[in-house]
């Protein structure tokens, strides 16, 4: 018996790019409000998407770009609580170091013609000429007065 693969694309390029772009926000200082964007103190030389997480027992940082996937995790094998204030920073430093060492040239996903890039204020969600780029599948005026 040989299984026959049924090739079926489950995700479309536009949705993937929107999700990838959203995951770059932890590096963007524009998202610093009452608390800092989780990776704003650990910038990388090139674009990466990232997700961080922590509990009392461990901390992780996972990220990717078209060329690399990096995951760093810290915790104790015996499941002890991490009590040092710096413990949750370690995976971020590891991620930053590895990303900067591995990726020398910019490499990021290219938007398709179906996506519109709209600059917005990340706090208000309103149009802002020098705002953070937001991708939309729905046609929207580039400026609310248009």
Language-model-derived ranges and their functions:
Residues 1-145:
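A penicillin-recognizing enzyme superfamily signal
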């Amino acid at each position: 018996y040989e299984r026959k693969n049924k090739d079926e694309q489950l995700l479309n390029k536009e949705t993937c790019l929107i999700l990838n772009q959203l995951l770059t926000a932890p590096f963007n200082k524009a998202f610093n409000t009452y608390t800092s964007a989780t990776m704003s103190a650990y910038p990388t030389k090139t674009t990466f998407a990232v997700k961080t997480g922590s509990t009392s027992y461990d901390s992780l940082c996972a990220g990717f770009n078209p060329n690399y996937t990096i995951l760093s995790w810290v915790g104790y094998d015996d499941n002890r609580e991490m009590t040092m204030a710096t413990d949750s920073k370690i995976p971020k430093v590891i991620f930053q170091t590895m990303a900067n060492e591995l990726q020398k040239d910019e490499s990021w996903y290219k938007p398709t013609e179906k996506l519109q890039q709209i600059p917005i204020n990340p706090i208000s969600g309103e149009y802002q000429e020098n705002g953070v780029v937001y991708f939309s599948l729905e046609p929207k005026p580039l400026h609310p007065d248009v």
